[in-house]
């Protein structure tokens, strides 16, 4: 049986960022993708990730960039490797 504290915690906890998005790295991923020259489409990004062993399609990329899909640690690591940045940078942490 749950205690009243557990019930209150369940009501307060939301798996979203302050702005309601399901991830904090989507906008950074979109920004990095758009900086690639020649410009990389979401489909091209999905293709490159698939070549690296990560099975994401264009729709998943679109949802990630829009903050409408969670990003796993495995996916985050693959994005960081592909773009040549740190996971911390994708998450918005300052460089040390």
Predicted feature residues:
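DNA major-groove recognition helix of helix-turn-helix
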Residues: 49, 60, 65, 75, ...
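Short alpha-helical elements of helix-turn-helix
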Residues: 27, 43, 58-59, 73-76
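DNA major-groove recognition helix of helix-turn-helix/homeodomain DNA-binding modules
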Residues: 72-89
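Flexible coil/turn residues that form the inter-helical turn or adjacent wing/linker of helix-turn-helix
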Residues: 25, 36-38, 54, 69-72
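A short, Lys/Arg-rich alpha-helix, primarily the initiator
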Residues: 2-38
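Residue-level recognition of specific faces of alpha-helices
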Residues: 28, 60-63, 70, 89
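Short alpha-helical DNA-recognition segment
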Residues: 38-63
């Amino acid at each position: 049986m749950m205690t009243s504290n557990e019930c209150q915690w369940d009501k307060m906890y939301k798996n979203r960022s302050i702005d309601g998005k399901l991830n904090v790295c989507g906008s950074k991923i979109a920004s990095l993708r758009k900086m690639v020259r020649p410009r990389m489409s979401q489909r091209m990004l999905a293709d490159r990730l698939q070549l690296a062993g990560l099975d994401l399609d264009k729709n998943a990329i679109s949802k990630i960039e829009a903050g409408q899909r969670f990003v796993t640690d495995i996916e985050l690591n693959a994005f960081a490797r592909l773009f040549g940045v740190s996971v911390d940078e994708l998450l918005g942490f300052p460089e040390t």
